[in-house]
Amino acid sequence: MKKQRNLRSMAAQAVEQVVEQGQSLSNILPPLQQKVSDKDKALLQELCFGVLRTLSQLDWLINKLMARPMTGKQRTVHYLIMVGLYQLLYTRIPPHAALAETVEGAIAIKRPQLKGLINGVLRQFQRRQEELLAEFNTRDARYLHPSWLLKRLQKAYPEQWQSIAEANNQRPPMWLRINRTHHSRDSWLALLDEAGMKGFPHADYPDAVRLETPAPVHALPGFEDGWVTVQDASAQGCMTWLAPQNGEHILDLCAAPGGKTTHILEVAPEAQVVAVDIDEQRLSRVYDNLKRLGMKATVKQGDGRYPSQWCGEQQFDRILLDAPCSATGVIRRHPDIKWLRRDRDIPELAQLQSEILDAIWPHLKSGGTLVYATCSVLPEENSLQIKAFLQRTADAELCETGTPEQPGKQNQPGAEEGDGFFYAKLIKK
């Protein structure tokens, strides 16, 4: 039996680590969830994700409710109050329970002397809620994005930026990829129906299914046997453009955690696939995914800027470059991205992408296909990146995705319920 812990204080400390220390919630949350009971795991996740999704609103409210910000060793209390406000605003937790548990969180973070302060701030919000929210809804903070990102979205998409920001603030659906080597999509949907769940096929991507209601993976028919993988529909779109064939030598560059590596092998089981990533730790997930699906690929640790170090002079029939990027297209899945990224990161990422493209291009065979993909919505990483590459690379030709003036295909967050994603298909003359 797991020791009863105060979830509100755990959520506050997790959010503090993201915002103040720049840590990823994906790294922080799983170990915390191991410390709580199964029934509390979902609530802990909801509190962490929810506070990060609405952080700018909660911050604005605290500044209105408190004369002075909490600093130094008391900073965790600031985030604990955020957790309390989030519950009052966005959850069905009865207000008295939300207040009581949040106030008790002060003991867990060793600040019992501040219980009265926390209680007072939250009760003041309850009294002034209508007035405060009316004022908040006139401010830029209502878009729940940092100002630098809003400015970039406004510049790139003068007509769409508000809908993009709104889509980023929604909860994402759960998309699955059916392993066509085991089941047709229709036959797996029948199994899902027998298990008491409902799914909907994607109109364009032949392996994609959206669950009506997200479910734990162990409840999915055949998950442990490799019949199905969790992967957003937009990420599955990479295979439409890559179109891998049996017998080909295919490189999946920046491959971790391996979702696209295994998709290549589902589409072309007899392809010779090399999966490369710079992060040795994340490569363990590539091995895990290959093992669960019963597949084989050559997995290597390597830097995409220096391919000769890990593949010599080898050339490939097809290359999938899922480039390192700002991840501004998947904010709805990872709301911490809004607070981890900085404006200065964008030119640095664009430079890295450019270096990888230039370095890997000589390793594509003549007549071969390279698909450049990101989960970003920013032109500097996408259309402008490919436009510049085409201008400096005489033997590169854009194929099927956009025009030389506006290269690539940009999926916006929420379009057909998928993530924000960019694809450009290039052919080597």
From Swiss-Prot:
GO terms for biological process: regulation of DNA-templated transcription; rRNA base methylation. One of its GO terms (molecular function) is RNA binding. Keywords: Cytoplasm, Methyltransferase, RNA-binding, rRNA processing, S-adenosyl-L-methionine, Transferase. Its EC number is 2.1.1.176. GO terms for cellular component: cytosol. It catalyses: cytidine(967) in 16S rRNA + S-adenosyl-L-methionine = 5-methylcytidine(967) in 16S rRNA + S-adenosyl-L-homocysteine + H(+). The active site is at C375 (nucleophile). InterPro entries: MeTrfase_RsmB-F_NOP2_cat (IPR049560), MeTrfase_RsmB-F_NOP2_dom (IPR001678), NusB-like_sf (IPR035926), NusB_RsmB_TIM44 (IPR006027), RCMT (IPR023267), rRNA_ssu_MeTfrase_B (IPR004573), rRNA_ssu_MeTfrase_B_ent (IPR023541), RsmB-like_ferredoxin (IPR054728). It is found in: Cytoplasm. It comes from the Bacteria. It is an enzyme of class 2 (transferase). S-adenosyl-L-methionine binds at C254, A255, A256, P257, G258, G259, K260, D277, D303, D322. SUPFAM superfamilies: NusB-like, S-adenosyl-L-methionine-dependent methyltransferases. NCBIfam families: PRK10901.1, PRK14902.1, rsmB. Belongs to the class I-like SAM-binding methyltransferase superfamily. RsmB/NOP family. Specifically methylates the cytosine at position 967 (m5C967) of 16S rRNA. HAMAP family: 16SrRNA_methyltr_B. This is Ribosomal RNA small subunit methyltransferase B.
